Structure formats: structure tokens, C-alpha cells
């Protein structure tokens, strides 16, 4: 996981907002966070860090390779720690919850399809969208 020293190594000062936002991504039970999610966590912890600062820090972390940005169907950017391991996403259309998964068969099939069509696959992103089917889903909005 990135540390304050890592911030300095990539040319970013280890400021309180940067350290706190980095800590949120390292310790949050939820791996996929929007700027608004981060801001809400900061407010709940009584941190005086504005939403504009959150956006700026998230962009800096993305540019530095600490975070990855995903733009799912909701249209808002969702960030996660860039730990270098490829994975795909399942996205709930009801609440926006994101789950990661890795499936070697899917990865192989994508490579095979690319080769069959004359492509050497360099990178890809797969996001599957659906509705949770669990009756007791804790993430489903109450109706």
C-alpha cells in the first residue's frame, strides 16, 4: 500500500488532506469510492477538507498512478487503489455498489477473441451491470 514516503517519491508533499484521503482508501471497507463518498467520510470524521480539495487530490493520485478511475453507467467517477492486479467489475444498477472479480476463463476468452480478429490485446476493462437478486441485500435502497 502507498505510504507518505511514496507520496514524496512521486513528487507530492505529504499534506494532511493527501494523507487522510490516502488513509481512507487504505482502510475503508468499501474499495470503490466517489469524491462525494470520500468527502462524506471526511465530514463524519470532522475533517475540515473541502470537496474541491478532495477532487484535486483524487486527480493528483490518479495521475500519479496511486488510484484508478472508473466511469460506470452512473456517470460519476469511482476511484480505487491501484494495486496493480487486473480485475473486472460487477455494478449494481439499483444502488451502484461495485464488486470486483477475476475469472481466468473470461480472461482467456477475451485474448482468444482478440487474436481471432487480428488484435494483440494490450489492456481491457470489463464491467457487468445487473440487479442484486438477494432478498436481504444490505445495499439495496429501501422502498
From Swiss-Prot:
Alphabetized UniProt keyword annotations: Cytoplasm, DNA-binding, Iron, Metal-binding, Repressor, Transcription, Transcription regulation, Zinc
Annotated region (Dimerization), positions in chain: 84-143
Positions contributing to Fe cation binding: 86, 88, 107, 124
Major place of residence: cytoplasm
Keyword Cell membrane: no
Top-level division of the source organism's lineage: Bacteria
Similarity comment text for this entry: Belongs to the Fur family.
Record protein name field: Ferric uptake regulation protein
Organism: Cupriavidus metallidurans (strain ATCC 43123 / DSM 2839 / NBRC 102507 / CH34) (Ralstonia metallidurans)
